[in-house]
């Protein structure tokens, strides 16, 4: 018996109002500097999340990590100071694989998804490894997101910048 699976990713288009505004490109995404998140067309506009054209995932973690860079850069910009924040394209996400297991990936502009411990040098989770612990981490993340991250509470040992992989 011959089996095949075709996996396709639909074209990710930005919102129609972005096109109507004149800010967007042919994909209705706003072109920005990928490090500062500042519009390439209007220096008073910064764009975060799904609306910008950075070469990164459109996952919520990207927007979350963009916030810190944006806040610092925006405050420096309105104070007429040079912007010092630089977004590194950091993204991470859990991928459910079924049967109570999941994988976890972590990457940025420089480093593709890689194996290794997460979030500390000893784990307890493993990147690019299917496990029950990663699945439980995904389930726990909902609570952490709503009760810790949104309140901007710091998590010990967790950096918003992607750390160099141990094997790089």
Residue ranges and their predicted role:
Residues 36-42, 61, 76-81, 124-129, ...:
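Short C-terminal domain-edge/linker segments immediately following a structured domain
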Residues 8-14, 78-79, 88-94, 107-125:
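Short, surface-exposed, charge-dense and proline/glycine-enriched linear segments
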Residues 22-30, 45-54, 85-94, 132-141, ...:
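Noncatalytic linker/hinge segments flanking ATPase motor cores
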Residues 51-91, 95-97, 105-106:
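A conserved FAD-binding loop/helix module that cradles the flavin
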Residues 28-46, 97-118:
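FAD-binding beta-loop-beta segment adjacent to the flavin cofactor pocket
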Residues 104-168:
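C-terminal auxiliary extensions adjacent to catalytic cores
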Residues 4-68, 75-76:
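FAD-site-proximal beta/loop scaffold in flavoenzymes
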């Amino acid at each position: 018996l011959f089996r095949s699976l075709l996996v396709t990713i639909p074209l990710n288009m930005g919102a129609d109002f972005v096109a109507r505004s004149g800010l967007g490109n042919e994909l209705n995404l706003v072109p920005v500097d990928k490090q500062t998140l500042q519009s390439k067309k209007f220096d008073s506009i910064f764009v975060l999340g799904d609306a910008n054209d950075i070469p990164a995932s459109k996952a919520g973690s990207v927007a979350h990590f963009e916030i810190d860079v944006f806040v610092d850069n925006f405050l420096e910009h309105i104070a007429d100071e040079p912007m010092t924040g630089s977004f590194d394209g950091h993204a991470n996400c859990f991928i459910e694989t079924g049967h109570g297991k999941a994988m976890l990936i972590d990457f940025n502009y420089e480093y593709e998804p890689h194996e290794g411990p997460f979030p500390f040098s000893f784990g307890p989770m493993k990147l690019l490894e299917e496990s029950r612990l990663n699945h439980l981490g995904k389930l726990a993340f909902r609570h952490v997101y709503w009760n810790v991250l949104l309140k901007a509470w710091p998590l010990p040992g967790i950096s918003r910048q992607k750390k160099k992989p141990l094997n790089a």
